Regions:
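Glycosyltransferase-associated regions of secretory-pathway enzymes
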Residues: 1-103, 121-277
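Small-residue hinge/turn detector
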Residues: 104-116
């Protein structure tokens, strides 16, 4: 695939990618994020049909975004699409241990290839044109390259809702590091968040030198006013419950934050050694 080549110096290539990307995209693409909404449903053995509450939430987003292109990406649709456009990524996708890893990885691939907005199926839309609604008035004519919102602990970049311009080097970097990050971290929850989830993406964010391309939506604006969670967390396991209980205790919360910082440092070293794939 043309956008990814082997044996690249990461730091040099990020800067080169930004220069090329900024010079090649047209004026309209520079100003606006594509109005394309992506959602992903990958079924498991026990839950082949989408939960009703997810379908209701998805319908709310579709109805409020009739001027957006919309795709619900299923496992079969993803595999067919990857076979045509990203055949080199298909083995990476299939080699994940858990469906949630596949979902997280595909968020980055789809936002890189198409641009637009990704939103989890457990989020109900409450506003039209979410891309514009997430931005202050002075940023709506010339939209930022990437829209994110950060986790409360400052050690993760939430991946439940994200928006980006097409072929952006930030998501190129994310996709290029997924293979190297696909490791077992001894706990189910840690494996999810560190190999492809929010903590993985925060590691990519830390590596990316052009911080001015990001806009961070305040959680106080996002939740309750623009979107509403209808009850997700279907991927959570028993260790997630245990970790959550620890995090409610201040002493354990500090310990867990410290442990995650150490793990992040290890991840950064792994990703630093890895080359683009």
């Amino acid at each position: 695939m043309k956008h990814f080549t082997q044996d690249e110096n990461k730091s040099t290539m990020i800067k080169l990618d930004m220069n090329i990307w900024q010079s090649l995209i047209n004026d309209s693409s520079k100003r606006k994020i594509p109005r394309y909404m992506h959602q992903i449903w990958i079924s498991s053995v026990n839950h082949e049909e989408m939960y009703d509450r997810f379908q209701i939430a998805a319908n709310s987003c579709i109805e409020l975004h009739l001027n957006y292109n919309y795709t619900l990406w299923t496992h079969e649709k993803i595999k067919s699409w990857l076979t045509i456009y990203y055949s080199w990524f298909l083995p990476i996708y299939e080699n994940y241990r858990y469906d949630m890893q596949r979902i997280d990885a595909m968020k980055y691939v789809l936002l890189f290839h198409f641009g637009g907005i990704y939103i989890d199926l457990d989020l109900k839309c409450k506003a039209q044109d979410l891309i514009s609604a997430m931005l202050p008035l002075d940023k709506r004519d010339n939209e930022p390259d990437i829209i994110l919102h950060m986790g409360a602990e400052g050690i993760s970049a939430n991946t439940d809702i994200m928006a980006a311009k097409r072929f952006h080097p930030f998501f190129k970097l994310a996709v290029s590091q997924l293979k190297a990050a696909n490791r077992w971290f001894y706990l189910y929850h840690l494996t999810i968040i560190l190999s492809a989830g929010p903590t993985f993406l925060y590691g990519i964010y830390r590596q990316f030198p052009f911080k001015n391309v990001f806009y961070y939506v305040p959680n106080s604006l996002l939740f309750g006013k623009l979107i509403e969670c209808v009850g997700g967390e279907t991927w959570h396991g028993q260790d997630t419950i245990l970790i959550s209980r620890f995090m409610k205790n201040k002493m354990w919360s500090s310990f867990m934050a410290f442990a995650l910082i150490i793990i992040l440092c290890v991840i950064f070293k792994i990703l630093k050694k890895a080359r683009y794939r």
